[in-house]
Amino acid sequence: MKAFSPVRSVRKNSLSDHSLGISRSKTPVDDPMSLLYNMNDCYSKLKELVPSIPQNKKVTKMEILQHVIDYILDLQIALDSHPTIVSLHHQRPGQNQTSRTPLTTLNTDISILSLQASEFPSELMSNDSKVLCG
């Protein structure tokens, strides 16, 4: 006599499963759409957190990243120029202040970066299944 296992119906994850964050024990490498949804969630979170990004206007992912970089540099400058920090950490001789690149300069490189962006997904995939934004 042979043992038979019951046949399970194969069901694709519905959009509601993704929006609820329900995972069917797949890693991002196994499910590229899940990785895409997670990345889009991360971009949405960044858009909410950075005050210089207009909330009522659609912005590209590249623009979001540019605003994030600008915001981080602004915060670094604010920290570096705070009187308490300045008195604690005197600038070493020969060490220059980091200069900030304006967004307009970064926008000129978008075409180059967008051509290279097609290579990123395969390079960034890892076996790490942690969700970075959430």
Curated annotation (Swiss-Prot):
Modified residues (Phosphoserine): S14, S25
Protein transport among keywords: no
Principal subcellular localisation of the protein: cytoplasm
Location in the cell: Cytoplasm; Nucleus
Single GO MF annotation: transcription corepressor activity
Motif Nuclear export signal, chain ranges: 106-115
Keywords: Biological rhythms, Cytoplasm, Developmental protein, Nucleus, Phosphoprotein, Repressor, Transcription, Transcription regulation, Ubl conjugation
Subunit structure: Interacts with GATA4 and NKX2-5. Interacts with NR0B2. Interacts with CLOCK and BMAL1. Interacts with IFI204. Interacts with NEDD9/HEF1. Interacts with ASB4; this interaction promotes ID2 proteasomal degradation.
Name of the featured protein: DNA-binding protein inhibitor ID-2
Highest classification ranks of the organism: Eukaryota, Metazoa, Chordata, Craniata, Vertebrata
